[in-house]
Amino acid sequence: MKTYNIFSIDEFKTNIENNSRLLGIDPGKRNIGLAICDENKKVSTPLKVLQKNKFEVLIKEINQIIKENHIKGIVIGNPINMDGTSGKSSQSASDFAKNLSKNITIPITMWDERLSSEGSFKMTKQLDTNVSNRVNKLDKNAAAFILQGAIDYLSN
């Protein structure tokens, strides 16, 4: 049976290198938002939005980003329901993480992203008044919001 490199957030902390960058992923239905953090794991920055294509294409794009940015760990948003239960979206994110872990060897963790889309929307709306620009930035801003939550936790 395949052993996945998916860890709890506390296990993740012990499996990532100090002074390394992380990749935040917000796996949506149509798009996948990406964000990265600095080597000190203090600030997350929106990176880009990938179209949800064939999984092989996504893996190739994500591997390229990992290589170019010297990424040493991945934080994937887990859309847990407000009551703490896992729904369809959470199961989809878990499946995405498992499939990703079969193709990528760096540590992966899932991070509770409750309210990240709402927070991302408010942040994007404040920063950009152009509606079409907001739509394009929402997914990568959500990934940055998710990653920031995780790195804030990791720094404590």
Question: Which functions belong to the PLM regions below?
Answer:
Residues 2-23, 30, 35-156:
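Phosphate- and other anionic-substrate recognition elements at nucleic-acid/protein interfaces
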